């Protein structure tokens, strides 16, 4: 008789006290002391796949998981400083091209930004969120498979947001280890507080999520299906 060996992996979770969330500060201070202090959000590890070979992408866009063609851009895999810098260049170039076409041919274009990412670095992500609002050309975001952690921040900042039927999103707190002298830890905590405020501002201003609901979602690792994303205002349409 064939023996089946099962290896059970156990995870240790920090105890999170039950709190009454009456203010934004309550959200940000929930279990931050166990979860933060760096410029990155904890990302969900998802196996990465290369783009289909038959698709011809611009050579410039092959680095850093940024692929695409004119007005169609794809973000695949971990979000890093390098590929956020590339993505910023691509968005600015697309915006310039769109304005030139509008002036010369009177044809309007939008930038389609397709996202398949488990998240990554927060600080460069916040710049991409700002840039989407700053350029003149509308950016339509598409969740293709999954947009977790910092990738969800980029997605919700689109002028119009789409998700495929079986795709999902996830939002949570920032994560990292804290070390150093007491004063340094206090400084890092204050930095964390400010960054969590920035994250909360984006979700609260771009979605239908209430402060209390946001508190709950930030503290848990909950995959939100497309229907829930639509209900919460994380997306505008399921395709």
Ranges and model annotations:
Residues 1-18:
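N-terminal chloroplast transit peptides
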Residues 22-239:
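Terminal-region recognition feature
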């Amino acid at each position: 008789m064939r023996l089946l060996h099962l290896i059970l992996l156990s995870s240790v979770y920090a105890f999170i006290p039950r709190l009454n969330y009456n203010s934004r500060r309550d959200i940000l201070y929930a279990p931050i002391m166990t979860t933060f202090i760096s410029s990155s959000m904890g990302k969900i590890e998802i196996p990465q796949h290369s783009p289909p070979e038959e698709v011809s992408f611009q050579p410039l866009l092959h680095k850093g998981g940024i692929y695409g063609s004119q007005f169609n851009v794809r973000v695949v895999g971990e979000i890093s400083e390098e590929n956020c810098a590339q993505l910023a260049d691509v968005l600015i170039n697309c915006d310039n091209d769109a304005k030139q076409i509008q002036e010369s041919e009177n044809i309007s274009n939008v930038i389609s930004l397709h996202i398949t990412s488990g998240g990554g670095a927060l600080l460069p992500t916040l710049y991409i969120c700002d840039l989407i609002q700053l350029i003149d050309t509308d950016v339509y975001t598409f969740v293709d498979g999954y947009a977790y952690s910092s990738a969800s921040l980029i997605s919700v900042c689109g002028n119009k947001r789409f998700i495929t039927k079986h795709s999902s999103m996830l939002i949570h707190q920032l994560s990292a280890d804290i070390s150093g002298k007491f004063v340094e830890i206090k400084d890092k905590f204050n930095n964390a507080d400010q960054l969590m405020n920035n994250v909360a501002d984006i979700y609260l201003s771009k979605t239908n999520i209430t402060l209390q609901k946001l508190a709950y979602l930030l503290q848990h690792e909950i995959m939100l299906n497309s229907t829930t994303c639509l209900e919460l205002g994380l997306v505008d349409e399921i395709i």
